[in-house]
């Protein structure tokens, strides 16, 4: 590291906004850590849209790709490396909720990224609320190293009553 001109040559994070096509307007963070390239989607619960390892894609994107489309689940499902399902649809007692839940379609707030000892830390909050219903906050933080991704999720109930919730991490591998 002493002879390195700038740490961003090997470890970096950049805010990215897509400008064209169906993904136009999507806000993301693109992270490079040597062997890994990871795209975090701020507009979709800070889920991971894609991962490349040593330059090779290891995640699945559907035909829809990253998009800003409104419509049915089948019309807007992106796939992505990490697709978080929940918090209102993951349990045996839930009925009449959308497939995969609504969390993925909620924007992250208070989003940050920083370099920390050769890793990149990315985090933010995702709030799932309803009038006369839930007030749940997902505090999400990732640590991306040269060849690994660690996730830390903490759910806080900011409502006035107890609330049931669940999270399911759908990992989509592809090539």
Identify the residue ranges that each predicted region occupies.
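Surface-exposed acidic/polar loop and edge beta-strand patches at domain peripheries
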Residues: 1-150, 158-166, 170-175
């Amino acid at each position: 590291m002493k002879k390195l001109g700038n740490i961003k040559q090997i470890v970096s994070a950049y805010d990215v906004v897509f400008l064209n096509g169906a993904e136009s307007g999507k806000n993301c963070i693109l992270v490079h850590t040597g062997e890994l390239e990871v795209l975090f989607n701020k507009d979709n619960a800070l889920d991971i849209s894609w991962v490349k390892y040593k330059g090779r894609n290891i995640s699945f994107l559907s035909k829809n790709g990253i998009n800003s489309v409104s419509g049915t689940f089948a019309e807007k499902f992106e796939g992505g490396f990490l697709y978080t399902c929940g918090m209102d649809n993951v349990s045996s007692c839930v009925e009449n909720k959308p497939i995969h839940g609504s969390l993925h379609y909620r924007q992250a707030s208070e989003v940050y990224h920083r370099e920390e000892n050769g890793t990149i830390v990315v985090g933010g909050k995702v709030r799932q609320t309803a009038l006369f219903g839930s007030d749940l906050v997902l505090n999400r933080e990732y640590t991306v190293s040269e060849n690994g991704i660690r996730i830390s999720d903490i759910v806080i109930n900011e409502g006035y009553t107890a609330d049931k919730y669940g999270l399911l991490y759908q990992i989509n591998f592809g090539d």
